Regions:
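N-terminal FAD-binding dinucleotide-binding subdomain shared by FAD-dependent oxidases/monooxygenases
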Residues: 2-116, 121, 130-260, 275, ...
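Class I S-adenosylmethionine-dependent transferase superfamily signal
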Residues: 299
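Flexible, glycine/small-residue-enriched loop-and-beta-strand segment within the central core
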Residues: 271
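Ligand/cofactor pocket segment of small-molecule handling proteins
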Residues: 296
Length: 641
């Protein structure tokens, strides 16, 4: 690791906790060593076969009529109730072990004070530190349960991992870092290295306590501070707490009879065990979601037999991966603001599929539009716009289903791989090698629709009376969506946790960033949070800007705390509910986006669109009406001393 400009001089022993002689601040050296050099890989490959990089045209007369709508409903209803997941506790707790780092660095427990404590060390935390530092906030501390930075890119290091948003728009601070991604769609391994370089350059490692899981955070009304308890015995006090631990952080395991009896080796994709040699082995993978779509082609290249157990097929769209060209790097080097301009152009695209394809001509500014906008004789009502989107989505899905027929040779396998739900209802996937994998003689799709795998034995997986013998079993069963465990351990003014408040009265926030009764708490990228659309890091840009703005506002007013009025929260929650209900036909399937069909409207993601979210944010910042500022910063500072 290179030293950062902020690093204090340390002794030869480089203690885990030291004091900066210039400022008196505590600095840390708790970054864990990499567990093994075998943890390495790549993402999408560039494919030369043009037939694999284009979708067939939609069939003539394709229309989302009553017959097709009934087919979609039957596809959905046949799977209702099939999603059954369990907590990773007891004998299943091992699936959460950190397999990527050496054991935690030993350190003493901390019981001191800081101004800002942030939970997480992914892009949200890295961006926030960059901006806080620039704004003059330096008494900032981070807690991260993993052994290094990266967030989702730390935990997800499976073979084939890559980002589905183009790297030129996804990676933050590209110009500041002087970095050009090697591929249009960067691999997770490259993204992790980029996170590490960011952390080194801006002194993040000195501020972060790694292998430190926050277990409980309690508000002290008398002192206007949070007390943060961790699994390392810490009881740190902070004026402000920021949740920056992401939206897909808790892995899920499907509840399957007999899974504990499996005699072979098994692991979850978010804890990929690189000590397990897969070459020449019989391997099974349960799941065909976004992760499995990236994993399967890589497994197919090395294993002896591969069994892919699928309950619900994904949409397998064209990826068309390519390397960054020397000409692009030369052009961008001469073009100040190139990355920001590209990111903002991406944000103007309203179609998720178009945004995720990343049209280079449009994003580079060579053309004014990706394609001509369709014009209607009159302005459509919101309901008519939804119906128009459904019709467009249906034609795209027809093309995606036609692609399956064009690529997969076995008709039975092809039929099982065709999805029947609105495009984007489940997370879209992109790959040019996934479908061809099922033409290989040693790769077998086991169609477990509609209810999924129900039995595992010591020898392997059983379905329809057939036992599939396995040496290794991989669970690609995904993550809980916006269900971070942090919500269970944040205790606010009335003694309730955030989870208890939301369970009793429904999810209620203001902008997704505040919740009434939890002063000086900021929730980044949580339920009802908006502003980002399809590029997650653009949302983080907005959220981090907001947190810095609020801290500067509190400092300027000399206030100790900020909370939200109950009325502002109720109005925003109602807006989130209305936006969800209006657009719900676009998500008429069972997926983690809607809690497998069980989530209350407005309780998860924000569906009002980035423009509406920013409109509400700007109005709040201009008027300050939704906020309740109390106390004086001097009193809090005295209490901290």
């Amino acid at each position: 690791m290179t030293s950062s400009p902020d690093s204090a001089t340390t002794s030869a022993t480089h203690p885990a906790i030291r004091t900066d002689p210039a400022t008196g601040a505590k600095l840390f050296a708790t970054r864990a060593a990499k567990a093994t050099e075998r943890i390495a890989g790549k993402g999408y490959s560039a494919v030369s076969d043009e037939a694999l990089k284009t979708l067939p045209p939609p069939p003539p007369g394709a229309k989302f009529d009553a017959e097709e709508q009934a087919r979609y409903r039957e596809f959905k209803e046949s799977r209702r109730g099939a999603a059954d997941y369990m907590a990773m506790e007891g004998e299943f707790a091992r699936y959460l072990d950190d397999v990527y780092s050496a054991p935690p660095v030993e350190r003493e427990a901390l019981t001191d004070d800081c101004e800002v404590l942030v939970i997480g060390a992914g892009f949200g935390a890295l961006l926030l530190w960059y901006k806080l530092r620039a704004a003059g906030f330096t008494d900032v501390r981070f807690c991260e349960k993993g052994g290094d930075v990266g967030g989702t890119w730390y935990w997800n290091r499976y073979p084939g991992i890559a980002c589905d948003v183009e790297a030129y728009s996804y990676l933050p601070l590209l110009e500041e870092m002087g970095y050009f991604p090697s591929m249009k769609f960067a691999s997770g391994f490259e993204i992790l290295e980029y996170c590490q370089t960011m952390a080194e350059r801006y002194g993040f490692y000195d501020r972060c306590l790694f292998h430190t899981t926050v277990e409980r955070t309690e508000w002290d009304e008398a002192e206007s501070r949070w007390t943060v308890h961790t699994d390392r015995g810490d009881a740190m006090r902070a004026r402000f707490v920021v949740l920056a631990n992401g939206i897909l952080t808790t892995p899920k395991l499907a509840r399957i009879d007999g899974m504990e009896s499996f005699a072979g080796q098994s692991f979850h994709t978010s804890r990929w065990d690189y000590t397990v040699d897969l070459e020449g082995k019989r391997v099974g993978i349960i799941g065909t979601g976004a992760t499995a779509v990236q994993v399967v082609p890589e497994l197919a290249k090395i294993v002896r037999e591969l069994y892919v157990f699928q309950r619900t097929p994904s949409t397998i769209d064209v990826r068309d991966q390519r390397a960054t060209t020397p000409e692009e790097i030369a052009q961008w080097s001469r073009e100040p603001g190139w990355a920001l301009a590209r990111r903002e152009r991406l944000a103007t695209i309203s179609s998720g599929r178009t945004a995720l394809q990343g049209n280079d001509d449009f994003l580079s500014g060579k053309v004014e539009a990706v394609k001509p906008k369709r014009r209607y004789e009159r302005e459509l009502t919101p309901e008519e716009r939804i119906q128009a989107q459904l019709n467009t989505n249906f034609r795209i899905m027809e093309q995606i289903r036609a692609r399956v027929d064009a690529v997969v040779k076995d008709p039975k396998t092809a039929a099982a791989l065709k999805p029947y739900y609105p495009y984007g209802c489940k997370r879209p996937t992109f790959h040019d090698e996934f479908l061809p994998s099922f033409n290989l003689p040693h790769v077998t799709l086991v169609d477990t629709a509609p209810l999924g795998v129900k039995k595992i034995t010591p020898a392997g997986v059983v379905h329809d009376g057939v036992e599939y013998p396995l040496d290794v079993l991989v669970y690609a069963t995904g993550f809980e969506w916006m269900a971070t465990g942090s919500f269970n351990m944040i205790v606010g003014r009335d003694g309730r946790t955030l989870r208890e408040k939301w369970r009793e009265g429904g999810v209620r926030t203001f902008l997704g960033l505040h919740s009434h009764g939890f002063p000086n708490l900021f929730i980044m990228s949580g339920p009802q949070g908006g502003g980002g659309q399809f590029n997650f890091t653009r949302g983080l840009e907005g959220h981090t800007d907001y947190v810095v703005w609020m801290l500067k506002t509190l400092r300027a007013r000399g206030a100790a705390t900020v909370d939200i009025t109950r009325d502002a929260e109720e109005a925003y929650a109602a807006h989130c509910r209305d936006a969800d209900i209006l657009t719900r036909p676009l998500r008429d399937c069972l997926s983690y986006y809607n809690g497998d069909g069980n989530a209350e409207p407005g309780s998860l993601a924000y569906y009002g669109g980035p423009a509406k979210w920013h409109e509400r944010r700007i109005a709040a910042q201009a008027s300050l009406d939704p906020y309740v500022f109390e106390g004086t910063a001097e009193r809090v500072a005295a209490a901290g001393e």
